[in-house]
Amino acid sequence: MVALSFFQRSTDRIHRSHEFWNGRKKGFAIASIMAMFMLNILFLANLSYLFGTVFKLPSRVHNFKVLMVDFDGGVIGQSVNGAYQNMKGNTFPTLVQHDVSEYPTEESVRQAVCRGDFWGAVYTHTDASNRLSAALAGGDAASSYNPADTITYIWNAVRYPAFASGYLQSNLVQLAGVAEVAYNRINGTGAAQSLNVTDAAAVQALLHPIQATAAPIQPTEQGTRVFYNTVGMVMPILMQFFFVMGINGISTQMQFLSRLPRLDNYIVRMSLSLIFALTAALVMTGYTWAFKENWAVTGSDFGLTWMVLWLFMHINYYMYDFLTAFIPMQFIPFFVFTWIILNVSSAVAPFELTAGFFRWGYALPAKELYDVLNTIWSEGCANYNYRALPILFSWWLLGTVASVFSMKQRCDSAKRNEEEEKAKWERMLIKGDEEMHQNPAGLSKAGNKDDLEKNESQSRAPSTTQNSV
């Protein structure tokens, strides 16, 4: 029945050939075309920007600086250097070799990566070449030889885990494999001459002399890690947008903006925004911890994550509070979508792998939020709080100042709209009184009703001309 009623002619609607459409069809067509055009341009520009952040990304992997320290000082260290020379290129991290005097211990190498001086590090173990030479001779040295006690590589697994595992860890594992080949090329003849061929363990040591050992800072293997700097940046922004739209609607419906003083409105909105940002940050921290699996984060990490997310949430509240006060509602989606894409683009990939143009994203709050979270989750490593926290608080202070002007604009606009609505009703009442005085004295209510129905019927009928017979 519903489908049939859709095709039945309506008796109380304006016909498409009615004079109502005169001058409106062209305007409707132009407005519709402009809306479609602007939406296409919006998505083209924003998605081009987002895709541009990772455009030709593998060719910039060489910007990952990896510390190389040779504690061995023998043929295994030479093998690692030889392997790097074979693999060196734009798609491979750059090994920066430093002397043992600069990094005298393995812990000092680890701390260099932790500080963020390097994205990773590779070091050979002390006396690794001597142990291998002794193993080739057979005996107890061969049976106890461990190829994993030759090379160790380090990286901070919390920092951009998808890129770190794909372009850093995998390449360092490959480096160790090529180092074995380089060892056979450099020392294969000498090793074969000293090999005890009757000892199976010695032969095994020659066939598999080198194996890399991974020593990541804060292993981050949970599947949800891919969301932390992608979808995780979108959710806080959307939550605050929905909150602002909701509180705007409630304030308008309850006539708070037009009836209450500005200061009262400001206190109410500020209090509600702080409470919602606090609870929303708790929700986000909660579902992050709920799916952390075996991730070794602590209770203090939970509290710090909650607090920095609270700050980020409130920054986004200020952003939408300001936009919705000064920008017409039909244009708000354009700004919301653009703000989301810009923030996600700033955090989705390390700037070492993006074109230099995108580094202006250091000024965006999402980038600084993710840097602070990396520091929290990696037990203080990759500490860029000296840059990130001042930028975040600058956004918050700017928003606090802007919220004063947005509240003034919001209250003034509500008062102005109320006065215009009041004036409109007054004009309608005055016009109605004038029409009542102009009606003939003996006109009955029934006659007026018949005339109204007749005029209404004529206005809805198609405007056609009938030929006289």
Per-region residue spans from a language model:
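Extracytoplasmic/periplasmic domains immediately adjacent to an N-terminal transmembrane anchor
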Residues: V2-G223, E420-V469
